[in-house]
């Protein structure tokens, strides 16, 4: 029997408001433990919450960008459970009347477009953070308690780990473009829970659902799903049954492990939050927010293709991140070869960002600096290969490219007489390759060019090198 997977995702995104959802405490990441707190977010007796209007606005922005219906009337609810990181012993969330519902995003997998439904988006407060650094017990940091979140719940419309990965990538891109969240998984501002089950191909009944946690990257989501789908199919093929539970992804072992049996919604004893009035979103306010939405990724991609002549692949990669798209456009306005800019962004820039774990706005290289580097290549001051060395130094130090070229003596050798002397020496030292070239072996030319580059430490002008080599070899 063949099986297929059914996947749904729950994404929690911290909102980029300056203050928390029900009080005036800062939402800044990285403060000393328990310094961004007050009686309200600590849930002390006698305190009352006041809903931050910006939270509603940002949630509506996200909802509109994700093609949702925005509720004119919604309310907050108490979700009751006890855990040390939850100071009130309940979380203020939304239950039966979410702010946004019935949305969708379109993803592209294997050249085909698929629509993934979004069941709901609701607002809620974040919990604190448990720190297990001490063997004698755990510590709680309440700085995060009360930070505003939106929870985006997809329909179970995904059937492969690749679809889940593409959905998350698209969702992150839209949240960044709307400036609703910075989506930094390493800081916990984007968190993903995955629900997955398997069923016989062609069946309409859903299988037993497993929730996966501890997923700290989109690739981890993909790997965890790949493993979990295989595990569930194996259990069923061996005549076993799937137990509804929450499982943890163990990155080191590459497996999922049981955490706890899955709670149902009624375990939380939801009831309306008595200390907050209902949320009213008027049509006028909704329209005002809609008009403030920026250019979305798919529109920007189309524009980059038509306006800058980028290939579709380049435009898709560049526009997947708002920060990279903005960087590209600043370069393209100052430099007349947009394709060269995209090559650098997708090549050396991307490689070094991946190696260092930095985002483009955390790197000391500005668009103006990259343009200067490209112009140094165009003007024959440095070669393309030397430019990579210069760029690495720029990336690490923030120095201007011309300063690095001067300091390290990297200027290209473009003096014909100087280069001819070096080439004559290379020819004299490699008679076998010279003979091979004269006998029609084109590869020998590549070897000789390489020897010239080696002798000049990569500083020989490539075009001039080829020209002089051919002249000398024809003598």
UniProtKB/Swiss-Prot annotation:
User: InterPro entries given for it?
Assistant: Asn/Gln-tRNA_amidoTrfase_suB/E, Asn/Gln-tRNA_Trfase_suB/E_cat, Asn/Gln_amidotransferase, Asn/Gln_tRNA_amidoTrase-B-like, GatB, GatB_C_1, GatB_Yqey_C_2, Gln-tRNA_amidoTrfase_suB_CS
**Cross-referenced Gene3D superfamilies:** 1.10.10.410, GatB domain, N-terminal subdomain
Catalysed reaction per UniProt? L-glutamyl-tRNA(Gln) + L-glutamine + ATP + H2O = L-glutaminyl-tRNA(Gln) + L-glutamate + ADP + phosphate + H(+); L-aspartyl-tRNA(Asn) + L-glutamine + ATP + H2O = L-asparaginyl-tRNA(Asn) + L-glutamate + ADP + phosphate + 2 H(+)
- Please name the PROSITE patterns in this protein's record: GATB
Leading EC class: ligase
Establish whether keyword Ligase is in the entry. Answer: yes
Q: What is its EC number?
A: 6.3.5.-
Q: Name one GO biological process term.
A: translation
Q: Name one Pfam family in it.
A: GatB_N
Q: Name one GO molecular function term.
A: asparaginyl-tRNA synthase (glutamine-hydrolyzing) activity
- Please tell me whether the keyword ATP-binding is annotated for this protein: yes
Which keywords does this chain's UniProt record carry? Answer: ATP-binding, Ligase, Nucleotide-binding, Protein biosynthesis
* HAMAP family attached to this UniProt entry: GatB (MF_00121)
Q: Which family does it belong to?
A: Belongs to the GatB/GatE family. GatB subfamily.
Q: What does this protein do?
A: Allows the formation of correctly charged Asn-tRNA(Asn) or Gln-tRNA(Gln) through the transamidation of misacylated Asp-tRNA(Asn) or Glu-tRNA(Gln) in organisms which lack either or both of asparaginyl-tRNA or glutaminyl-tRNA synthetases. The reaction takes place in the presence of glutamine and ATP through an activated phospho-Asp-tRNA(Asn) or phospho-Glu-tRNA(Gln).
Share what the entry says about its subunit structure, partners included.
Heterotrimer of A, B and C subunits.
Q: What is this protein called?
A: Aspartyl/glutamyl-tRNA(Asn/Gln) amidotransferase subunit B
What gene codes for this chain? gatB
């Amino acid at each position: 029997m063949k099986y297929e997977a059914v996947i749904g995702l729950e994404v929690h995104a911290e909102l980029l408001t300056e203050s928390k959802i029900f009080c005036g405490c800062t939402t800044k990441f990285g403060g000393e433990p328990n310094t961004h707190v007050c009686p309200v977010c600590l849930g002390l007796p006698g305190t009352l919450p006041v809903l931050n209007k910006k939270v509603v606005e940002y949630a509506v922005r996200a909802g509109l960008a994700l093609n949702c219906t925005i509720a004119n009337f919604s309310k907050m609810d108490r979700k009751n459970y006890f855990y040390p990181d939850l100071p009130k012993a309940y979380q203020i969330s939304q239950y039966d009347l979410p702010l946004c519902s019935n949305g969708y995003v379109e993803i592209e997998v294997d050249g085909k477009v698929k629509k993934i439904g979004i069941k709901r988006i609701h607002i809620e407060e974040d919990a604190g953070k448990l720190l297990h650094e001490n063997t004698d017990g755990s510590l709680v940091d309440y700085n995060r308690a009360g930070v505003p979140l939106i929870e985006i719940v997809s329909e179970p419309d995904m059937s492969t780990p690749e679809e889940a990965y593409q959905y998350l990538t698209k969702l992150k891109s839209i949240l960044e473009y709307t400036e609703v969240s910075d989506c930094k998984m390493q800081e916990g501002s984007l968190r993903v829970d995955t629900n997955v089950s398997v069923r016989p191909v062609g069946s309409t009944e859903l299988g037993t659902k497993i929730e996966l946690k501890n997923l700290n990257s989109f690739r981890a989501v993909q790997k965890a799903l790949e493993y979990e789908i295989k595990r569930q199919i194996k259990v069923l093929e061996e005549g076993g049954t799937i137990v509804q539970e929450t499982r943890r992804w163990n990155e080191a072992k590459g497996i999922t492990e049981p955490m706890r049996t899955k709670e149902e919604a009624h375990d939380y004893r939801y009831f309306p939050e008595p200390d907050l009035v209902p949320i009213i979103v008027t049509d006028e306010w909704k329209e005002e927010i809609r008009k403030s939405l920026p250019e979305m990724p798919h529109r920007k991609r189309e524009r980059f293709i038509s306006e800058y002549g980028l290939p579709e692949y380049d435009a898709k990669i560049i526009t997947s991140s708002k920060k990279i798209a903005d960087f590209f456009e600043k370069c393209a306005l100052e430099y007349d070869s947009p394709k060269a800019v995209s090559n650098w962004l997708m090549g050396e820039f991307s490689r070094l960002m991946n190696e260092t774990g930095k985002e483009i706005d955390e790197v000391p290289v500005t668009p103006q600096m990259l343009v200067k580097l490209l112009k140094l290549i165009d003007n024959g001051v440095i070669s393309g290969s030397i430019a990579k060395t210069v760029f690495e130094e720029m990336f690490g130090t923030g120095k201007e490219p011309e300063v690095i070229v001067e300091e390290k003596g990297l200027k290209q050798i473009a003096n014909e007489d100087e280069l001819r002397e070096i080439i004559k020496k290379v020819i004299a030292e490699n008679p076998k390759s010279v003979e091979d070239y004269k006998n029609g072996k084109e590869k020998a030319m590549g070897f000789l060019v390489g020897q010239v580059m080696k002798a000049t430490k990569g500083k020989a002008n490539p075009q001039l090198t080829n020209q002089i080599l051919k002249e000398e070899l024809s003598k």
